[in-house]
Amino acid sequence: MMRLGITTDSRVQNGYGRYGADTYKKLAEHGYFGTDFNLSNTETVPYTLSREDAEAFLLREREMARAAGVTIWQVHGPWRWAPRDFLPEDRAERMEKMKWALWACSVLECKNYVIHPLMPYGIEDIGSGNEESTWEINRTFMRELLAEAKRYGITICFENMPMRKFSIATPEAILRFVQEMDDENFRICLDTGHVAVFWDLDLAEETRRLGKYIRVMHVHDNRNGLDLHQLPFDGVIDWPSFAKALKDIGFDGVFSLECGAPGKLPDALFERAARLCADIAADIVRDL
């Protein structure tokens, strides 16, 4: 069976943080091989710590995961909502944080670093006349970031987005960008729920389109054209069809959830719901 993973991001209803130092032990107990370590919020720990204290924090996380038999399979790099990439100084600040997170990724001994495209004209540039500028700003930014990633031996995983009027959002657009970058350290994070936001896209078909370029995944479901990060089977995705597509392309990575049991549940209910989440994921990939 394909290995399972799950995010540590509390903003997508992940309540594993309640377990404190035993978080990774709980992940292992529930059947997870790996985790998606969240470094998206640059206004919180470890970004707010000194370099020395940040390294100590990251090393503790790494060792707790290792002791529990859990692999930090991927790291989610900086992301802010609403996007603020409009000015050169905004993008310079992003670059500084992105490079810091790459260093953090290296301390965690993680080789997969997930990031979003820059949105210098906001989330709706299609039809504005700014599409090519959006692409060129991203090319310039990502080339510099890629050079830093290669220094650490880390692969940048460029994520498809749920913005229907943004020019670097669909799997097709992400694939074109990655192919233009033309580097084995620049690959794709397939976000299943983001594909589901587009009414006219079929996840299985898009998975086959991306094929060998898929390095990591964000797995969740959506409905009503919204990015809700719901559990599989709670939205519009055909999960058996998606599983077949993964088998067809020979994907051998981690089936990593970007959803989870509601964090507000009392402990006893959360335990049961969290196990159910893992069971749902395991059922989807049981033949892979």
Language model features: what each stretch is:
Residues 1-33, 66, 95, 99, ...:
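Histidine-acidic metal/acid-base catalytic patches
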Residues 1-10, 73-84, 120-126:
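N-terminal small/glycine-rich loop or linker at the start of catalytic domains
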Residues 38-61:
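Glycine-rich, proline-tolerant flexible connector loops at the mouths of alpha/beta enzymes
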